[in-house]
Design a protein with these regions (language model features):
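Conserved hydrophobic/aromatic packing and binding residues within compact polymer-binding modules
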Residues: 23, 37-38, 49-53, 80
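Short, basic-rich loop-to-helix N-cap that marks the start of a DNA-contacting helix
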Residues: 31, 56-71
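Recognition helix of helix-turn-helix/homeodomain-like DNA-binding domains
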Residues: 42-59
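Residues that mark the N-terminal boundary/hinge immediately upstream of a DNA-recognition element
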Residues: 22, 33, 62-65, 76
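Short alpha-helical "recognition helix" segments of helix-turn-helix
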Residues: 36-39, 69
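A short, Lys/Arg-rich alpha-helix, primarily the initiator
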Residues: 2-29
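Short C-terminal boundary/hinge segments that cap the last helix of small helical domains
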Residues: 63, 72-84
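Residues within the alpha-helical elements of helix-turn-helix
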Residues: 29, 40, 72
Length: 84
């Protein structure tokens, strides 16, 4: 029998926020602006990066974002999952 997941919506929201904080921290450490990162992953506006980093308007990074951001920042995608 397969175990049911015990993560609540609040748990998942905390995970999204942690990932956003980690992306922001690493981006800032690398000296890359939100605009430059947005353009590097194929977006024309900082809104996607800004909202996802702060988990605003129910926005969060998806796996495609994270793969592209890791590539642009030159880090391993697992670095975004620290402290989860």
């Amino acid at each position: 029998m397969i175990k049911n997941s015990e993560f609540s919506k609040d748990d998942i929201q905390r995970i999204y926020k942690t990932i956003g904080k980690n992306v922001k921290r690493i981006r800032e450490e690398k000296g890359i602006s939100q605009l430059n990162l947005a353009m590097a992953i194929g977006h024309k506006s900082v809104g996607v990066i800004s909202n996802c980093e702060l988990c605003l308007q129910n926005k969060h990074f998806n796996i495609e974002h994270l793969v592209k951001i890791a590539d642009v920042l030159g880090v391993n995608i697992k670095d975004f999952f620290g402290n989860i």
